[in-house]
Regions:
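The feature captures the beta-strand-to-loop junction immediately N-terminal to the Walker
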Residues: 43-45
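Helix-to-loop junction immediately C-terminal to a conserved catalytic motif
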Residues: 58
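ABC ATPase NBD coupling module
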Residues: 75-94, 124-125
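Conserved signature/switch motifs of ABC ATPase nucleotide-binding domains
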Residues: 146, 167, 199
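Conserved ABC ATPase signature
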Residues: 147-151, 155
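Catalytic Walker B motif of ABC-type/P-loop ATPase nucleotide-binding domains
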Residues: 172-175
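Helix N-cap at the start of a conserved alpha-helix in ABC-type nucleotide-binding domains
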Residues: 183-185
Length: 232
């Protein structure tokens, strides 16, 4: 896929990011950048570090050394980040986990508006309105009152995407987004991601799905042994 029109400076930049767990080097100097409006796919075998990179970008995984830059915000290794820096980071990033992690006892709409109200201080009425708009954008407004267990896999994923977009982040991270989807749902997701890019989002996706990555990604970064080994 050709690069998106109008791409500007990097929204995301990783420089020589390293992570060890005991004697194992999980990330061995990961360096790459992502421009605004790109869909970048991280591919590689299990254990290559794809999901770890996403969690690290989102501030969910500490790392020993290197730098992660998200727009004008710099995250450093070895725990040298203030609570305020991490709070600002989470306003810039939305993450969709492989297994969604929706709260099973809460309706879909509450799953979307809960974090903006309680973690980001968004007024309740504004957060509810935003949740309704996002569910409509993603085509699941009719499931607003459904519990997660009542949703299909595709519906649950769309609610999870709505939740990730609830604080209007410029960067969206997705871990194995096609894992539970059939061919038709994959096509729907591909179209949705293009729509999100058209609205000014930037996406980084970790996936094993070669066909999906090649059909929707601006670039594919291939990881092996904790580093980016090639890109195409």
């Amino acid at each position: 896929m050709a690069a998106a029109d109008g791409m500007t400076a990097h929204v995301l930049q990783l420089n020589d990011v390293r992570l060890r767990r005991g004697e194992r080097e999980v990330l061995a100097g990961v360096t790459f950048g992502v421009h605004r409006g790109e869909i970048v796919a991280l591919m590689g075998p299990s254990g290559s570090g794809k999901t770890t990179v996403l969690r690290l970008i989102a501030g969910l995984e500490p790392f020993q050394s290197g730098i992660v830059q998200v727009e004008d915000l710099t995250i450093v290794g070895n725990g040298g980040n203030s609570a305020n820096t991490l709070r600002l980071l989470r306003c810039k990033i939305g993450m969709v986990f492989q297994f969604h992690h929706l709260f099973e006892h809460m309706p879909a709409a509450k799953n979307v508006w809960l974090a903006p109200v309680h973690a980001h201080g968004v007024p309740f009425r504004e957060a509810v309105r935003r949740a309704q708009e996002l569910l409509a954008l993603l085509g699941v407004e009719h499931r607003a009152n459904a519990l997660p267990g009542e949703l299909s896999g595709g519906e649950a994923q769309r609610v999870a995407i709505a939740r990730a977009l609830a604080v209007d982040p410029p960067l969206l991270l997705m871990d194995e987004p096609t894992a539970s989807l059939d061919g038709a749902r994959r096509s729907e997701l591909r179209e949705l991601l293009q729509e999100l890019v058209g609205e000014g989002r930037t996406l980084v996706i970790a996936t094993h799905d070669e066909e999906f990555a090649s059909s929707c990604a601006t670039r594919v970064l291939r990881m092996n042994n904790g580093m980016v080994s090639s890109q195409d």
